[in-house]
Design a protein with these regions (language model features):
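Short beta-strand segments that buttress and anchor functional surface loops
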Residues: 100-107
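Short beta-strand edge/turn micro-motifs at domain boundaries
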Residues: 110-132
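Short solvent-exposed beta->alpha transition segments
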Residues: 29-33, 37-44, 48-93
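Ser/Thr- and Asn-enriched, surface-exposed coil loops between beta-strands
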Residues: 94-98
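Bacterial N-terminal signal peptides that target proteins for export
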Residues: 1-9
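Boundary of Sec targeting at the N-terminus
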Residues: 23-26
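N-terminal signal peptide c-region/cleavage motif recognized by signal peptidases
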Residues: 17-19
């Protein structure tokens, strides 16, 4: 009986601690680390809806207003372009009032990513690329 009580108590403690630990990890994650996680998630995504939670609310709203067939086509084009980029290197992270601006580089291109904080979590607001 004591063992059952201990197991239940441990389970309760762990269930209460897990969300707190996740929030701590999110709070200590840098904008660069978030962006790298975003790129990995994007590479694995099968549809744009898979990455919408990582996008800023304004960008999510634009995507959600786009007709489903156009969204699918745009996502396919983005997948091709990001795959062609290969590995992206973050050269610099600059703090801003709303989050951070990342200076990026990949083979043949330079880019920037605007990462903002929404509800205490990092979100991708904008990303742009130009040829070197």
């Amino acid at each position: 009986m004591k063992l059952v009580c201990r197991v239940l108590t441990l389970g309760l403690v762990l269930s209460l601690a897990a969300p707190a630990l996740a929030n701590t990890e999110q709070a200590t994650q840098s904008a660069t680390e978030f962006y790298q996680a975003y790129r990995k998630a994007f590479a694995k995504a099968q549809k744009i809806e898979d990455i919408l939670p990582m996008m800023a609310a304004s960008q999510r709203a634009k995507m959600e207003k786009t007709p489903a067939d156009e969204r699918k086509m745009m996502f396919g084009m983005l997948k091709e372009m990001t795959a062609a980029q290969g590995d992206v290197k973050v050269l610099k992270e600059t703090a801003t009032k709303t989050g951070a601006e990342l200076t990026l580089e990949t083979k043949g291109e330079k880019g920037t990513a605007t990462i903002i904080k929404e509800g205490g979590a990092w979100k991708l607001d904008k990303e742009s690329w130009t040829s070197k």
